[in-house]
Structures are given as structure tokens and as C-alpha cells.
From Swiss-Prot:
The keyword Cytoplasm does not apply. It catalyses: FMN + ATP + H(+) = FAD + diphosphate. Keywords: ATP-binding, FAD, Flavoprotein, FMN, Nucleotide-binding, Nucleotidyltransferase, Transferase. Its cofactor is a divalent metal cation. This is FAD synthase. GO terms for molecular function: ATP binding; FMN adenylyltransferase activity. Its EC number is 2.7.7.2. Belongs to the archaeal FAD synthase family.
Length: 174
């Protein structure tokens, strides 16, 4: 004798596998920067961003973009910076930015939140929000307010100190 028990479909029953059930959408945060000579400010921004999401995607500025904006190329080449950033604990994925459209990586990733570092100058919060809205994309954008103060809180300061120590002279970089 075979007994067949037919159980009604019930979302609350753990014994029933619902193939239509989708796992909850992971919240994605995106932050961007050069991340050339790593310092505590970078880690502060990355940790802040990760606290606001399940996944953190970091967009690294391309060497040519950095040269155009800052007037100098990064010390560490983009592919090497990408390897360094993607191995950091809070980072789930690192991608290189676009050479032609700074919004392209954002529109590709479609983050739930964009985190701007405290010294971010490439993106201004309201300007970025408006540019994304013009392209039909709405997302939360926050700026890290806490600026980590320490002797070497910027890549620029680290570079100046290296030159001072190695060349034994003070210089002003572009």
C-alpha cells in the first residue's frame, strides 16, 4: 500500500521548496577614487560604505583620468591598484572606471547607495544626483563626513614625505 500525502503550498512551511522564491536583493554600495597610496582615510571610507550595504563595489580612477584631473599620473598603475583594493576586507569587487563617461560604471553596477569620500572633488553630491536623474537613475548618495586626521591622511602628503626623506628637501607637488 502506498500513501501519498499532498501538502498545500505554504510559504511558511520549511519542507516545501518554492522555486519561484527569490532570495532577498543584496544592497550594493559603490564608492570611487584613485586609491593610489593607501592611507587611513581610504579605509575609513571603505568601511563606512560596507556598513551601508551587503556588497561593496569600488570604482578605481583610470591612470589617464587621474592625469587629466590632478595633473599627474598615479604612482601605482591602475591594474596594480585594482589588485590591491579588491583584496581589502570590506571590498567585494573592484572595477576600473570609464575613460569617457564617469557615470558609466554607476549605471552598470546600479548601486543602492553611492558613498563619496570626505575629500571627493570629482563628484559633488547634488550635481551627481542630478546627472544620474537625467539618465533615469535614482539612488541614495551620501558623503562621509568624518575626515581621518593623522600625519599622512592623504596620498599627496605621503608622496611629499617620501620625497622629503629621500631627497632631503621640501617640494610642492602639482
Amino acid at each position: 500500500m502506498i500513501i501519498v500525502i499532498i501538502m498545500p503550498k505554504n510559504e511558511n512551511n520549511p519542507n516545501i521548496k518554492n522555486n519561484n522564491h527569490q532570495s532577498p536583493k543584496k544592497r550594493i554600495a559603490l564608492t570611487a577614487g584613485t586609491f593610489d597610496l593607501l592611507h587611513p582615510g581610504h579605509f575609513n571610507t571603505l568601511n563606512f560604505a560596507k556598513k551601508h550595504a551587503d556588497e561593496l563595489v569600488v570604482v578605481l580612477a583610470r591612470d589617464e583620468t587621474v592625469k587629466r584631473i590632478k595633473g599627474r599620473r598615479p604612482v601605482i598603475p591602475e591594474e596594480q591598484r585594482k589588485i590591491m583594493i579588491e583584496t581589502l576586507k570590506p571590498v567585494d569587487k573592484a572595477i576600473l572606471g570609464s575613460l569617457t563617461d564617469k557615470l558609466e560604471p554607476i549605471l552598470s553596477v546600479k548601486p543602492d547607495i553611492i558613498v563619496l569620500g570626505p575629500d571627493q572633488t570629482t563628484y559633488q553630491l547634488e550635481e551627481l544626483k542630478n546627472q544620474l536623474l537625467e539618465r533615469g537613475f535614482k539612488t541614495e548618495i551620501v558623503k562621509v563626513e568624518e575626515y581621518v586626521k593623522c600625519p599622512f591622511h592623504s596620498s599627496y602628503d605621503i608622496l611629499k614625505e617620501i620625497i622629503r626623506r629621500w631627497c632631503n628637501k621640501e617640494i610642492e607637488l602639482k
